Swiss-Prot record:
It holds the Pfam family Band_7. ZDHHC5-catalyzed palmitoylation may be required for the formation of higher-order complexes and for neurite outgrowth in cultured neural stem cells. Belongs to the band 7/mec-2 family. Flotillin subfamily. This is Flotillin-2. The keyword Glycosyltransferase does not apply. It comes from Bos taurus (Bovine). The lineage of its organism: Eukaryota, Metazoa, Chordata, Craniata, Vertebrata.
Length: 428
């Protein structure tokens, strides 16, 4: 009889022995195997990763500088059947620590040998290359043990004579110098670039300001053009409004003038009727005293004259202000005045001597007043004459000289008036 043994993927099961002196060995990992009682042997070996920390103290480099180097290595037993068999031959029955010690000693030996061939700068500055070189040199040796180096890295490198620190200071100084130079060059380039950027910014700003000014100027010009156009349209509208208003006022004034013309025509007609009525009244009252009739006619004539003068002055002022529109009124008024004067002249001509006598009688009181004006200051008149006939002759002489005086003052020849002619003739 026997047992069925199982194993996980992190271990390898080795079954050896058997009946009839068999030397067959079975290597199983991550599976199971059958082992006979008493005649089969089963052992296990770990396939897990083993972490090693090789350390080489005071190992002289190619330049004779003693360095201490520490590293970290990850190793494991390989699972290929041949290599697993090799590993089992060498490490089966040993603990993991024993296996780690064997591999560690191997790695440290190779690490020491490689340190002796390199300079401090090569080791310190290119640790990856150093670790790669150790891995490449040690891999064949540990591979013959069935061990695989998964990774190897240099953990630390230092010395006890401050060689690395001095090297670091020199390098630091070089780096600091290069950094200062780089900073200065960067600042120089930054200053140049900043100046260029400022120049570009100012150029852009000036271009933008120029475009803004051009846009503003174009806006102002367009605004002025619009304002000018609006002002022109407003002025045209205002002018059209004023012209239309003037036309309307002219029409209104024309209508007023026409109304005034009609009124004047009616007034002329009324005056003509008045003249006819006066004519009839004169015919009806021809026997009335000539003095009263003449005085009335004179007063009417004087009032009409003053009235016509004032009307003519007012109309002349109107005509002057309203221009050609009043020309028709002047013409109508002239015609009306001429018609009135014509009618009046016809009336005077019709009445003949009676009308002239009325004018003379109307003028005689004023003439007498002018002649007698100096006598208003005389208190009394004494006629010195012893003969009454002489006084009479003096009166007759004055009457005889009266027509000449009237003719000289008024231009009216009293000697041609029959009544006066008779009076003066009788005196003579």
């Amino acid at each position: 009889m026997g047992n069925c043994h199982t194993v996980g993927p992190n271990e390898a099961l080795v079954v050896s022995g058997g009946c009839c002196g068999s030397d067959y060995k079975q290597y199983v990992f991550g599976g199971w195997a059958w082992a006979w009682w008493c005649i089969s042997d089963t052992q296990r070996i770990s396939l897990e990763i083993m972490t090693l920390q090789p350390r080489c103290e005071d190992v002289e480099t190619a330049e004779g500088v003693a360095l201490t180097v520490t590293g970290v290595a990850q190793v494991k037993i390989m699972t290929e059947k041949e290599l697993l068999a090799v590993a089992c031959e060498q490490f089966l029955g040993k603990s993991v620590q024993d296996i780690k010690n064997v591999v560690l000693q191997t790695l440290e030996g190779h690490l020491r040998s490689i340190l002796g061939t390199l300079t401090v700068e090569q080791i310190y500055q290119d640790r990856d290359q150093f670790a790669k070189l150790v891995r490449e040199v040690a891999a064949p040796d540990v591979g013959r043990m069935g061990i695989e180096i998964l990774s190897f890295t240099i953990k630390d490198v230092y010395d006890k004579v401050d060689y690395l620190s001095s090297l670091g200071k020199t390098q630091t100084a070089v780096v600091q110098r290069d950094a200062d130079i780089g900073v200065a060059e960067a600042e120089r380039d930054a200053g140049i670039r900043e100046a260029e950027c400022k120049k570009e910014m100012l150029d852009v700003k000036f271009m933008a300001d120029t475009k803004i000014a051009d846009s503003k100027r174009a806006f102002e010009l367009q605004k002025s053009a619009f304002s000018e156009e609006v002002n022109i349209k407003t002025a045209e509208a205002q002018l059209a409004y004023e012209l239309q208003g003037a036309r309307e006022q002219q029409k209104i004034r024309q209508e007023e003038i026409e109304i005034e013309v009609v009124q004047r025509k009616k007034q002329i007609a009324v005056e003509a009727q008045e003249i006819l009525r006066t004519d009839k009244e004169l015919i009806a009252t021809v026997r009335c005293p000539a003095e009263a009739e003449a005085h009335r006619i004179q007063q009417i004539a004087e009032g009409e004259k003053v009235k016509q003068v004032l009307l003519a002055q007012a109309e002349a002022e109107k005509i002057r202000k309203i221009g050609e529109a009043e020309a028709a009124v002047i013409e109508a008024r002239g015609k009306a005045e001429a018609e009135r004067m014509k009618l009046k002249a016809e009336a005077y001509q019709k009445y003949g001597d009676a009308a002239k006598m009325a004018l003379v009688l109307d003028a005689l009181p004023r003439i007498a007043a002018k002649i007698a004006a100096p006598l208003t200051k005389v208190d009394e008149i004494v006629v010195l004459s012893g003969d009454n006939s002489k006084v009479t002759s003096e009166v007759n002489r004055l009457l005889a000289e009266l027509p000449a005086s009237v003719h000289a003052l008024t231009g009216v020849d009293l000697s041609k008036i029959p009544l006066i002619k008779k009076a003066t003739g009788a005196q003579v």
